[in-house]
C-alpha cells in the first residue's frame, strides 16, 4: 500500500514540477502568472518531496527534492540579476517617489488615502486606479501643484501623477489594445538634472497575450528615452516572470532586492511583488519600502528614494 501511495504522490508532484518548469521551454501566457510564484511553489514542492520520502525512501523521491531545490535556487538567482546592490545608501536622496494602486472601488478610504499622500513627503506620486480620489483632487493639487491625469471627471480618472515640481514635458498614451491611457511619460528637473518618469499599468498576464503586447509598446517607449529613467506601476507580475525578466534585461532596469511583497494583502510579507519601482543608470534606488497601511486597497503601495550617480558623484536636489 505504501508503494502505491508513494508512486501516486510522485506522479502528482512530477506533473506540478513539469508545469512550473515549462517556463524554461516556452512563455505560454496562460501560465505566466504561475511563473511569478516559482519561489513559493518551489518551497511547496520541497515540502511535498519530504512527505513522499517519509512514505518511502526511494531514489525518485530524492530526485524530486533536488529538482524542487533547483527551482528555488534559480528563483533567487533570477531576482538577484536586477539588484541595485545597496548603491549610494550613505548619500542624501535626490528625490522621493510613491507608487500606489489604490483600487478603483476603494471609495470609503479615499479621504485617508488623500491625507496619506499629502503627509508622505514624496516629491512625485504615481497613483493608479485613482477614480476614488475624484472628489479630493483640489486638496491634492494644493500640496502637489503639478499633475497629469484626472482632468475630465471621475469616469476618466485612472492614472494620476502628482509632482511638487513642474513637468518639463508630459505625455499620456496607450499600451496594447486592451485598455487606454495607462502609460504616462514625463520629466522633472531635480537639482539641475532631468529625470524621466514613466508610469505603467499592465494587464493581468492571463488575459490572453495582451500583457506581452503592452510590454513591447513599453519597451519602445523606454528605448526612445535618453538619460535617467524611473519606471513605476502595477505590472501584475513579479520580476521573475519570463516576460518581465526579458523586458528588464533589455532595458537595463534595476531595483532593490528583495522587493517588498505587494500582493495579495492577506499574505503580507509572504506574498509576491507585482507592483514595482525600477531605475535605469545613472539613476539608482537607495531605498524601497512598502507603505505601512494598504488603506483598503488590494495592493500595497511603495515608496522609493533615488540618487543620481555620474562618475561617482551624487547631485542633491535644490
Write out the residue ranges for each language-model feature.
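Short, flexible segments with low predicted structural confidence
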Residues: 5-6, 88, 133, 249
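Short, aromatic-rich membrane-interface segments at the entry and exit
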Residues: 31-32, 58-65
Amino acid at each position: 500500500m505504501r508503494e502505491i501511495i508513494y508512486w501516486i504522490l510522485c506522479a502528482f508532484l512530477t506533473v506540478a514540477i513539469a508545469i512550473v518548469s515549462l517556463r524554461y521551454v516556452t512563455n505560454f501566457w496562460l501560465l505566466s502568472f504561475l511563473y511569478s510564484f516559482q519561489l513559493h511553489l518551489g518551497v511547496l514542492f520541497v515540502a511535498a518531496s519530504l512527505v513522499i520520502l517519509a512514505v518511502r525512501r526511494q531514489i525518485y523521491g530524492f530526485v524530486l527534492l533536488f529538482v524542487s531545490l533547483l527551482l528555488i535556487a534559480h528563483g533567487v538567482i533570477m531576482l538577484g540579476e536586477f539588484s541595485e546592490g545597496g548603491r549610494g545608501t550613505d548619500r542624501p536622496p535626490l528625490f522621493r517617489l510613491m507608487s500606489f494602486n489604490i483600487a478603483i472601488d476603494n471609495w470609503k478610504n479615499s479621504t485617508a488615502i488623500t491625507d496619506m499622500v499629502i503627509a508622505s513627503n514624496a516629491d512625485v506620486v504615481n497613483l493608479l486606479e485613482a477614480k476614488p480620489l475624484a472628489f479630493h483632487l483640489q486638496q491634492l493639487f494644493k500640496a502637489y501643484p503639478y499633475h497629469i491625469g484626472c482632468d475630465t471627471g471621475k469616469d476618466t480618472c485612472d492614472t494620476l501623477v502628482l509632482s511638487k515640481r513642474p513637468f518639463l514635458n508630459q505625455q499620456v498614451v496607450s499600451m496594447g489594445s486592451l485598455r487606454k491611457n495607462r502609460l504616462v511619460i514625463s520629466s522633472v528637473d531635480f537639482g539641475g538634472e532631468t529625470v524621466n518618469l514613466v508610469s505603467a499599468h499592465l494587464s493581468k498576464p492571463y488575459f490572453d497575450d495582451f500583457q506581452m503586447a503592452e510590454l513591447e509598446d513599453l519597451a519602445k517607449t523606454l528605448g526612445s528615452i535618453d538619460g535617467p529613467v524611473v519606471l513605476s506601476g502595477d505590472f501584475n507580475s513579479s520580476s521573475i516572470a519570463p516576460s518581465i525578466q526579458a523586458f528588464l534585461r533589455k532595458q537595463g532596469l534595476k531595483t532593490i532586492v528583495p522587493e517588498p511583497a505587494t500582493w495579495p494583502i492577506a499574505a503580507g510579507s509572504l506574498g509576491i511583488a507585482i507592483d514595482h519601482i525600477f531605475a535605469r543608470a545613472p539613476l539608482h534606488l537607495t531605498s524601497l519600502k512598502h507603505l505601512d497601511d494598504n488603506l483598503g486597497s488590494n495592493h500595497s503601495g511603495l515608496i522609493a528614494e533615488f540618487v543620481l550617480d555620474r562618475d561617482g558623484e551624487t547631485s542633491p536636489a535644490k
